[in-house]
Amino acid sequence: MSHVAEEDELGLDQQLAGLDLTSRDSQSGGSTASKGRYIPPHLRNREAAKAFYDKDGSRWSKDKDAYSSFGSRSDTRAKSSFFSDRGGSGSRGRFDERGRSDYESVGSRGGRSGFGKFERGGNSRWCDKADEDDWSKPLPPSERLEQELFSGGNTGINFEKYDDIPVEATGNNCPPHIESFSDVEMGEIIMGNIELTRYTRPTPVQKHAIPIIKEKRDLMACAQTGSGKTAAFLLPILSQIYTDGPGEALRAMKENGKYGRRKQYPISLVLAPTRELAVQIYEEARKFSYRSRVRPCVVYGGADIGQQIRDLERGCHLLVATPGRLVDMMERGKIGLDFCKYLVLDEADRMLDMGFEPQIRRIVEQDTMPPKGVRHTMMFSATFPKEIQMLARDFLDEYIFLAVGRVGSTSENITQKVVWVEEADKRSFLLDLLNATGKDSLILVFVETKKGADSLEDFLYHEGYACTSIHGDRSQRDREEALHQFRSGKSPILVATAVAARGLDISNVKHVINFDLPSDIEEYVHRIGRTGRVGNLGLATSFFNERNINITKDLLDLLVEAKQEVPSWLENMAFEHHYKGGSRGRSKSRFSGGFGARDYRQSSGASSSSFSSGRASNSRSGGGSHGSSRGFGGGSYGGFYNSDGYGGNYSSQGVDWWGN
């Protein structure tokens, strides 16, 4: 210990002597070469600094935890390595040995945690020499980032039964479905990331969508939320990008860089209706682009656009965006869609319901995006009524219509209870339910209005319950904090408005309570789908009274279809409402007629193929031969889908998020 202290002391004396004109000779061993040399104050530390940078021949340390992705500086320290000459022998720190910039791994966030301020730093993959490398080869792993991306997830307990979900594909020359991920060539990077996510085998939608997308066919897919839709399009798209490389987009990026370098040309674009859903898809993209040169980015409203622009400027190959913010970015000249090969519209019906059709048409038809037939387009949603399918004609070319499970139905994994509760008794009944539920269970309570959410949260708080709430008027930060409190169990009760029905990607919600029932059955389906996700068991309780008569028949049909207990009073009300209204009992929602489960092109003779993912007895034929009690009028599905439920082995993978 004393020896070290002496060395430190001596080293300090030597450094001080270097600044002392009178004692330089004695400290430098009597060297005459340095005698009397004057060093101006502003230059006195330059030699020491240079020695630090150059002592191992690489300026910044080669250690994997180097300080910043701006890494080194040139010999003259005039500019960062971002603008430095990529050739020559000059070092770029930890990026030197790898011939790339700050992407040790997925999601473009660098080699460490994936979100640190250093890892997000300056080097852009577009400006790197990565195009000279084979994009299909994985980059070195990052243990820290791997832990961050793949440590969570619960695959559920009832996956086996979901191999039997029936599927129908409509269109010409439908590619055969797969039974395992290894049945289709997706490359080393994708297969490695599938293993890291602990996905054992594809869900029904993935079994059929992956080979269709790999064959570069346009696709319209109807599948329930939580069924693995996100991976169904991300896996084949990323696989193709790894195989094909950046192509002309990289050349355009470099050419644009000569004049300021700020416009990005993504290869793939994913449009989502809400910011929460966009973030969810982005997080999945980070997983599947781990150890690749693909850099995913996300842009959405309600957040600092300046930060999003700075993130884009570091490079963007796969962009996830909400329509409004994307139009803003395009008008600012930050995004160009000239070389977009893959377009995905996720929750397409939701986007149209929210009024995004003008923005979507502006993006797809009125800008520089390649036309249909040149680009590859996919639409995913839980519902696709005929009206939306007709709109899809403008975006899709010779597409395959894929329906997996009964679109709009619920899973048998969810136990549904409907109880008659007068409006004045709802709060008292809710307290009884909460008291009967385990303290560690996550409970989601749906109400109809923002004011109702705040009021109910305040009531529960004063009753001594740890709770929080979300609705459309909350800021992005408040919503994220509420979700974090709920997920972590600090506030195991979450009160949410209807805008949250398609959100909340939380794998362990045990109980969904419809404090206020929605006005249409599709909203009900999406709400109770927050529990019983991907193979787990769940409970949904709904408070019913005279205000909810309009959905009586639909609710009855849904309960019967899912083999749930039906209260006798509900059957009587449905019977009375059916004849009193003089109708078939269907509510007048825009989705009436089968939840979009029928391909409208079948009326003009389009071909179809029917598959079963499991037992042969469940492989009913397509066409129109099977009617159903839901009054679908002999459509191509009718009774084609049974009520076997729907699941998968993916818990953190669903694409449905709460949002506005």
From Swiss-Prot:
Testis. There is a cross-link at residue 214 (Glycyl lysine isopeptide (Lys-Gly) (interchain with G-Cter in SUMO2)). It is an enzyme of class 3 (hydrolase). Signal peptide: none annotated. A motif (Q motif) lies at residues 179-207. Residues 12-21, 602-620 have a biased composition (Low complexity). SMART domains: DEXDc (SM00487), HELICc (SM00490). Residues 1-11 have a biased composition (Acidic residues). Keywords: Acetylation, ATP-binding, Developmental protein, Differentiation, DNA-binding, Helicase, Hydrolase, Isopeptide bond, Methylation, Nucleotide-binding, Phosphoprotein, Repeat, RNA-binding, Spermatogenesis, Ubl conjugation. Its EC number is 3.6.4.13. PROSITE patterns: DEAD_ATP_HELICASE, HELICASE_ATP_BIND_1, HELICASE_CTER, Q_MOTIF. Residues 413-574 form the Helicase C-terminal domain. Residues 210-402 form the Helicase ATP-binding domain. Residues 621-632 have a biased composition (Gly residues). The modification N6-acetyllysine is found at residues 55, 117. Transmembrane segments: none annotated. SUPFAM superfamilies: P-loop containing nucleoside triphosphate hydrolases (SSF52540). This is Putative ATP-dependent RNA helicase Pl10.
